Amino acid sequence: MTSVITRRHFLASLPALVMAPKVMAQSGNAPIRVRALSHMTLTVSDPKRSVEFYQGLFGLPIQARQGPTSLLRIGRGPQFLALSGGGANLRPGINHFCLTVENFNVDRIVTILADHGVAKSDATGGGLSGGPMKARVRVRGAESGGAKEGTPELYVGDPDGIVVQLQDPSYCGGAGALGSVCPAPEPAPRRGLLAVRNLSHFTIGVSDPPRTIAFYQALFGLPIQAHQGASPVLGIGGGPQFLMFSGGGGGRGGANPAPPRPPRIDHVCLTMENFNPDNALKALAGYGIKPRGAATGPVGPLTSYVSMRMEDRGGAKGGTPELYFTDPDGIPIQLQDVSYCGGSGYLGNVCP
């Protein structure tokens, strides 16, 4: 995974890094205790094509449906990958991600959020959350796969407006008061070429990494479980799952520099057992996802490549291989071993 952080951001983050052991010790007393990564929703240009693509590659069954949105179960569930049509005005990408939290209660969590500067939004507009440092409750009705009386779903906008959904650990995207009632999964048409087991992490590009890290740690008490260069890796639920925040820059330099990229969820990582990058690349190539090779510039759809994370970014001495591919819309997906924690070692599974 690639992270970009300026010298100013690095210096500003030093106090947080020095306090890491204290943060780890206090994580159990966090205002909102996070259990695990739940899901992400991908905005895609052709939902039918994307369902066929992910089912053919991974063999994911349909766990639930929310109107036209299909929820594909990852591993044994309830974690999932949701695929939603974007319409003419929405670009393909990772729309939002979800964390599961202990003692999920909308009123309780909204009160805690308000104490941390996140105001409840009842106005229209501003996306799912209402905008940066806003929270919005959506009551999903039976027409969208929710309970007859409605299934509450809570969306939070972080300092950059990145949307984080918060739900109960039993949430499967289905009906019931907790969204935990899902029918028997609809099997994929055929067995996938690669078997993914779980969600690993999200890498998120933000405008001010130290500010964002402070926000997530203050709310969720996320401990630092590793470093990749100057960037800390924030553990989820005791690990190995995590979140990572990188600088939002990366525009073209020179006489006519490009503007920084807007804040975004850059990519998601899925895990598989017995991860072998060569075998995975071969399977991807057989599915029509071709190696990038020596090409430079933006990575187009249906392309794969391996990045070697070296010691200067917390990788192994000879490099930790990290495999990426893009789907039909060019959305990047990372694949790693089930033990991957963002640390060192060949599998990236050595975290202090």
What function would you assign to each model-found segment?
Residues R33-R65, S200-P209, I213, A218, ...:
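Mature N-terminal segment immediately following signal peptide/propeptide cleavage
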